């Protein structure tokens, strides 16, 4: 079986990671003790991807929980599914990273990283054929961003041919914990561009807007934001967890979604959007699902896809529905909005259907888009970064941990390069190459 090892780092990473395990354990019929109480063979057919089967038929998540302070991990352990994890897989320090990327990446995190790699190695060894890793973390703090990216590069060294997939929560001033978030995020993106194969950009700005505008929550809490994250994560991993043909493993997803190695930052979307604890009274139709799924308001990254073009798209429909109708709707979206899909990648939209819907919904759809509009998100962080960096504000926290200003400048220019690359492919047309060749022939 093709297994995935899950890592969660830092406060945010552990909170959304814990929610992820609650949601998928529920979908696979696994209770908090790890016992199976499901009602469908589909739930067990690919259970090995995320779970180890222990003695006595108990299922244990292939999860490694990491933090530089014990607080969040204690609350995960005492949470609803806290007892399902392997106790040895909790790896934590005592000092904390204090929202400082340098502490997570170079000092405190570097001391803990070998202990984490030992656990990762152990999990990888119990796999029959490991396909890759997924990490949940935020880019705004110290541990998830600094130590998370350190873990990625260390795992990359040791498992160079395995896929590295991250769920990265991008900071926003609307839901801000600290003033140095733009620094931490820029330094992290600098690492993610080079070291991951696929990154789902989960943008706090977008999550906040969805809660506020669509779900009409006047003061969204982290619980509300995490509810959206867990729905999205459950959706984008559906193809990996349930039997199916399309994007059935991380590598096939990467092949379909990533046309150029650096451009692997995806914009996830979800439909229908529901608030925590609410029930859906009316099942949506396939056309409604498709329309909502492509709607800018349903995107988990605060970028408007109408400001860019899609390089590639993967859609996952869940629930009992007519495949024919799904195909018709997806084709209709593409033909009506053809200008928003680059024409030099034919068949760049792929659709999968899974019979098992998420809990509480009859039908749902998840969207994964590789759109050039994601540059808006990087521009936003870059502007905030520059505003502080030109004054060298708060830099002493980083240089005090042994970092050099040079590294900030490099990270900044790498992110700006990424923005220009997206822009370049947004403007590219299919004919460009042909004209150049003709011109050369005439000159000759």
UniProtKB/Swiss-Prot annotation:
Which residues does Mg(2+) bind?
69
**Compartment list:** Cytoplasm, Cytoskeleton
Keywords carried by this UniProt record: Cytoplasm, Cytoskeleton, Disease variant, Dystonia, GTP-binding, Isopeptide bond, Leukodystrophy, Magnesium, Metal-binding, Microtubule, Nucleotide-binding, Phosphoprotein
CDD domains named among the record's database cross-references: beta_tubulin
Q: Kindly give the Pfam families that the UniProt entry links to this protein.
A: Tubulin, Tubulin_C
Q: Which residues carry this modification: 5-glutamyl polyglutamate?
A: 436
**Any idea which GO molecular function terms this record carries?**
calcium ion binding; GTP binding; GTPase activity; structural constituent of cytoskeleton
Gene Ontology CC terms = axoneme; cytoplasm; cytosol; extracellular exosome; intercellular bridge; internode region of axon; microtubule; microtubule cytoskeleton
Which domain of life does this protein belong to?
Answer: Eukaryota
Q: Needs which cofactor?
A: Mg(2+)
Q: In which tissues is it expressed?
A: Major isotype in brain, where it represents 46% of all beta-tubulins. In the brain, highest expression levels in the cerebellum, followed by putamen and white matter. Moderate levels in testis. Very low levels, if any, in other tissues.
Entry's Gene Ontology BP terms: microtubule cytoskeleton organization; mitotic cell cycle; negative regulation of microtubule polymerization
InterPro entries given for it? Beta-tubulin_BS, Beta_tubulin, Tub_FtsZ_C, Tubulin, Tubulin/FtsZ-like_C, Tubulin/FtsZ_2-layer-sand-dom, Tubulin/FtsZ_GTPase_sf, Tubulin_C
Binding site residues for GTP: 11, 69, 138, 142-144, 204, 226
**Residues the record lists as Phosphoserine modifications:** 172
What note about domains is in the entry? Answer: The highly acidic C-terminal region may bind cations such as calcium.
Give the UniProt family note. Belongs to the tubulin family.
What task does this protein carry out?
Answer: Tubulin is the major constituent of microtubules, a cylinder consisting of laterally associated linear protofilaments composed of alpha- and beta-tubulin heterodimers. Microtubules grow by the addition of GTP-tubulin dimers to the microtubule end, where a stabilizing cap forms. Below the cap, tubulin dimers are in GDP-bound state, owing to GTPase activity of alpha-tubulin.
Protein name, entry field: Tubulin beta-4A chain
Which species is this UniProt entry from? Answer: Homo sapiens (Human)
Which gene holds the coding sequence for this protein? TUBB4A
